[in-house]
Amino acid sequence: MPPSSRIAMWSGPRTVSTALMRAWENRPDTTVTDEPLYAFYLARTGLAHPGRDQVIASQSTDWRVVLAEQTGAPLPPGVSIGYAKHMTHHLLPEVDRAALAPLRHAHLIRDPRELLNSYARVRAEPEVDDLGLRQQAEIFETFGGPVVDSRDLLADPEPVLRALCRALDVPFDTAMLSWPPGPRDSDGVWAPYWYDSVHASTGFAPYRPPAEPLPARLEPLADRCLPYYQRLYQYRIS
C-alpha cells in the first residue's frame, strides 16, 4: 500500500456509485463513507432534497471538518483503506481544492443521455450542475486518477475492478464481486429515499440500455454535458 490509503471516488447521480461503494465495503480491509459533503452542500445551497433536515443533522456542514476527517482521522483497527463515495456537485467552489490533495482520486462516469434518462424521473427539469459532469472534469484536471465508465463496470465487473485496484495500487479482492442484500450502517440517512434497488442487490446488475429514448426536451442538456463526459471517457480503464 502507498502512504495514502484514502480513496475519493467521484461521480454524479445515477451512476451505480452506491453499488460500487458496496463492492468496496465488502472487502475486510476497507471502511467506507457515504457522501460526506452532502450536508455541507444542502446547507450552502438551500436545496430541498428528500430528507434534507435529517441529512443536515447527520453530518458536519463545515467542509473543513469533513475533509480533515477524510484526510487525517485514523482508520479503524485492521483496516488499511478508507473509501469515500463523493458526489461531484457537492464540491462547491468555496471548498479549498488543496485540502483534497492527500486523497487518492478516482472517477465513475456515465453517458449523460443514459444518466439524464434516469435522473429526470426524479427531477423533471435538471440543470447542468445537477449532473456533476462539469465539476467532475474540473476535479479530473486537478487531480487525475483512474476513470471507470459505469457501462463497462456493469458489462464485465471483474476485469474493470481488477484494473481499478491496480490503478489505485491496492490488491484486488474477489469479495468486491458480490455482497449480502440489505441496508448498511454506513448508508447515509437518505438511503430510504434512494437505495431501494441497492438494498435488494447482491452484486452488479447486468448492463441494460434505457428502455425509453431520452425526451426531446433534454437533448440540449445532454449535448451540453457530452464534452465533459467525453473528456473523461477517453481515459477510462477497461
Predicted regions and their residues:
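Soluble or luminal CAZymes and related metallo-dependent hydrolases
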Residues: 58-66, 88, 128-135, 156, ...
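PAPS-dependent sulfotransferase catalytic domain
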Residues: 84-175, 192-195, 200
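PAPS-dependent sulfotransferase catalytic core
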Residues: 1-76
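A basic- and aromatic-enriched beta-loop-alpha substructure that forms the phosphate/nucleotide-
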Residues: 52-109
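A generic structural signal for alpha->beta connector loops
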Residues: 27-30, 80, 102, 144
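PAPS-dependent sulfotransferases, especially Golgi type II membrane carbohydrate sulfotransferases
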Residues: 1-7, 174-238
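A structural motif corresponding to the C-terminal end of an alpha-helix
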Residues: 77, 139-145, 228-231
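Generic structural signal for helix capping and beta-alpha/helix-loop junctions
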Residues: 40-42, 115, 182
